[in-house]
Amino acid sequence: MDWGAYEYHAVSGSWIAKDFRHGSGFEHGLQCIIDPDVVVGDDVRLGHRVHLAPGTRVLDDVEIADDCVTTGISLLGSHVRVRTGSCISKAVIVDDWCFVAAGIMSSHTKNVDHARPQAPKRQLVTRFGYGSVIGSRTNTSAGVSIAPGAIVGYGSHVVTDLEIPNAVYYNDPHPWATLQREIDPDNAYYVEVPESYMPHQFDAELLAKYLPHYRP
């Protein structure tokens, strides 16, 4: 780590990159690390011991609680809430109004050549859809997509796409998340996605820099 790229904030005990850019209303807790090439919007609030890795992009009105990390290029949309101890891994997009509960582990994008140089290079993007709720202690495999308005139950293992929006998923009868029921439009938990809403995407420059082997 090039500590010359950081400034030490003595009051909070945090290391913050000199090129860090943020909007108005930014707040952070104690002992945070914000790496180079991180950009956050307005009214972003970080808890204690939060680590944002290079390539992280955070939009407006986002709360990231204590002991959370990003591990690389990632995008958190507006009005997202990430609760204590969650890991937003490299190549994860969290769309607007998503709630990520405590202790979520999203798997790193695939490019499994760490020990096998001849292995095919392939990088995948994971998506948590608009208004989805990801229950505590959920694990997600690389490259899965969770539909808008989906509710994923506690301790679920998401190994395939959860394709039906406004539906409940959890580990029953298998040890991975499967469809349990759909949510009625008159239910308070039903999420209406605005017709004008466009799911977030990584821009081309970020993809070229951090995910050169990603192919849509």
What are these regions (language model features)?
Residues 12, 29-31:
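Short secondary-structure capping/turn segments at boundaries of alpha-helices and beta-strands
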Residues 1-21, 66-67, 75, 81-216:
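Glycine-rich hexapeptide-repeat left-handed beta-helix
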